[in-house]
Amino acid sequence: MFARLVRSIFGSSNDRSLRGYQRRVQQINALEPELAALTDAELQARTILLKQKLADGATLDGILPEAFAIVREASKRVFGMRHFDVQLIGGMVLHDGKIAEMRTGEGKTLVATLPVYLNALTGKGVHVVTVNDYLARRDAETMGQLYSFLGLSTGIVVHGQEELERRAAYHADITYGTNNEFGFDYLRDNMKYRLEDMVQRDFTYAIVDEVDSILIDEARTPLIISGPAEDSSNLYRSVDAVVRELVKDPAAFEKDEKQRSVHLTEAGSEKVEEMLHASGILTDGNLYDTFNITVLHHVQQSLRAHTLFERNVEYIVRDDKVIIIDEFTGRMMDGRRYSEGLHQALEAKEHVTVQQENQTLASITFQNYFRMYPKLAGMTGTALTEADEFAEIYKLDVLAVPTNLPVQRKDGDDEVYRTAREKYEAVANLIEEIRTRGQPVLVGTTSIEKSEVIKQLLDQKRIPAELLNAKQHEREAIIVAEAGAPGRVTIATNMAGRGTDIKLGGNAEARIQTELADMPEGPERDAAIARIEQEVQEAHEAVRKAGGLFVIGTERHESRRIDNQLRGRSGRQGDPGESRFFLSLEDDLMRIFGSDRMGAMLQRLGLKDGEAIIHPWINKALEKAQKKVEARNFDMRKNVLKYDDVMNDQRKEVYAQRREFMNADDVSETVADMREEVIDTLITRHIPERAFQEQWDTAGLAAGLRALLNADIPVEQWGREEGVDEAEMRRRVQAAATELMDVKAAHAGADAMRYIEKALLLQTLDQVWKEHLLLLDQLRQGIGLRAYGQRDPLNEYKSEAFSLFNAMLDELKQRVTAILAQVEFGAPPPASADPFVSGSSQFVESHPEPVSIRMAVGPNGEDIPLPPPPPAMFSAAYADVEGIDFNDPSTWINVPRNAPCPCGSGQKYKHCHGRLG
């Protein structure tokens, strides 16, 4: 109550911020007459003047009024559209690095031109991020006309572009693209071998369109670049056949829909073991024995695929592929795959080709990618419900920008039915009634399957309807553009079509493009255009009189924001409209989050078949349930971020070190330091500090140095000499190693040696980082169990991840030292050949013969990864293990599980000859 009183006197913080922006709007408006009097050439010259002001020390805030006024005047001349005052406010919110909440139809795309132009004047590049390639292309092509008029260049980054196109796009003043493409380009750049091959510039400023979708809904979805791992497709198919039978017995497993988890019961474990033994998949022991851990993992993923993932809801099957459906947008996510074998389990379930498993080479979440921008802003129609999350995770404030005209949409109370069948019949009956008034209808559903149920009901009533879901992805823009035509019925999965306005009466531009595509320019085409525009204008007036667009929601989403997005499709720019949600006790939200009380209440009311209850109390109860779910999801995203931050800190260190190597002309000093550290560690292992000379293991040291440096160093002889202490031994060994490498360098030639050291360092860093990512993934999967031992899983993860990171750095030094010592150099590469131009070096190795090295690229110009180093280099890893014979696998039984396999595959022993089961 006190808070309401304070707001009534002083206004909310949102109101106070808006008043500050309003004063600057007056400054911008005051410049309009002066700029309107300029010729096009004079207006365009203002861009050069503003750039000069910045060069002379002016700030962006200082030139903001003039820059915004110039953009508004240019927009009037290029598009015939003048920015409203509220759009100027939206532009200032974005320039200040905040999130502007602007209702659907308020012209967010045009608003973005204001801060984009202003910040692009610095020449450092501005990124405009959209949710799909279609919107990126559309906005870049349309708004690019305005930027071009003002003397700025525009680039676009979309899927399938060549490197040269991408580099040119990023070096433009303004770059449009999707969140996926920006993120993947960052990862790809950090796998390059020359700075000049990188496509992105340093990050400066980004505006994220539909910011809630990208930074909230997709926050937990990492971008992953992966390479092929071992092929286990047969095991997936075999396990799928077993689990397919198992799930027919409900007593075999327990499912928790709130947590989206499933596990075997005791009876289920016994049953699946019997089936696995009978099918020959299990040959010894029980399912939970250590050596059967791989089979257990496959069973768990197959069980998830059969019980938690539904076809046409979470995914569709097309062209022999399982394609993920984005739960928030309903769009296909072609190219995205579930990790940890889940996607392969779904492929086996659907009897399509089981693709090879992949190993992560590089990954990043959108949370950590976008937090790298020094200045970040966003715009959306719905952000206030997630304001706390934006503030806590991204340090972004949310400001609600008022609409240009008052919202006239009528939002009806929810109607709740007992069953889904009754609900869908009520929806179909309402649509039939609405169409008679000439009102267009947009029906929102949560899955492809449910959208097709409604379509079938409408077909029975002979009501034509357009279906907009992942299966009609290609026609999305056309369907949405015409969704406002009189009597048109459009059924959309979630927010498919987001980013395209639904205009009452239809879209004249879309009709002209489709109906007159083949008609040549001339009087006939002009007449046809005039006719279409007249028809659309008449239809617009008819639909307005009929009540505008009627939005029907067929289910409440877990997030209020998604429901608000659906409602927001109606009532754009002061248009009339209506919205209403139809629910049933069988809906996911009602069923999972407390429909028992509501169901009991409906029974007490004596609700009959086909009847609904409509009461504001229902809306409040649902909103309360949604808030609980939103809070839970926020906590989950925060928790994921805490773990990802550990990897993110390590990733930043590795990428910074990698860039330092790329930038260096000569890394010989780094390589020498690595060699010195590795040799020091080896000496310490065999000659402990303050040990007597007779306690030295000089034979072991000699063997270790032979394996590491591919040379016999007479340490045993030195150890017998009078007066040789530990320090003298270290000095002699280091001097001998340096001399060996100096001889190699002289033989190879100075230039060739610099190439080789740099290539080796970068490739080996990539290799150990890839292996480290796999270890972190495995650590993350099981770390939650530490809670049972009264230990904090996050602290345990941080501690062990740090230890693994240090071990990775040690492995890097070991491999670089060993490989450089093992190689023999042929002729140096030709002076004109640069090994980093289009691919990386290929190291061909063997054991125990000396190694030859050559620079090469693959047949298609692809990078050829570094093959694993020879087994000899790992001898030091087995220094404390007796009886190891590298040529006899039967002697490897005591090899440490995490040590490199003695066979030389480059994999850890536990993933190779030490594989369990």
Swiss-Prot record:
Gene3D superfamilies with a match to the protein in the record: 3.10.450.50, Helical scaffold and wing domains of SecA, P-loop containing nucleotide triphosphate hydrolases, SecA, preprotein cross-linking domain
Compartments, record wording: Cell inner membrane; Cytoplasm
Reactions this protein catalyses: ATP + H2O + cellular proteinSide 1 = ADP + phosphate + cellular proteinSide 2
Record membrane topology: Peripheral membrane protein
EC number of this enzyme: 7.4.2.8
InterPro entries tied to this protein: Helicase_ATP-bd (IPR014001), Helicase_C-like (IPR001650), P-loop_NTPase (IPR027417), SEC_C_motif (IPR004027), SecA (IPR000185), SecA_CS (IPR020937), SecA_DEAD (IPR011115), SecA_motor_DEAD (IPR014018)
UniProt: ATP binding residues: Q87, G105, E106, G107, K108, T109, D501
Function: Part of the Sec protein translocase complex. Interacts with the SecYEG preprotein conducting channel. Has a central role in coupling the hydrolysis of ATP to the transfer of proteins into and across the cell membrane, serving both as a receptor for the preprotein-SecB complex and as an ATP-driven molecular motor driving the stepwise translocation of polypeptide chains across the membrane.
Sequence similarity: Belongs to the SecA family.
Subunit structure: Monomer and homodimer. Part of the essential Sec protein translocation apparatus which comprises SecA, SecYEG and auxiliary proteins SecDF-YajC and YidC.
Protein's UniProt name: Protein translocase subunit SecA
Protein species of origin: Granulibacter bethesdensis (strain ATCC BAA-1260 / CGDNIH1)
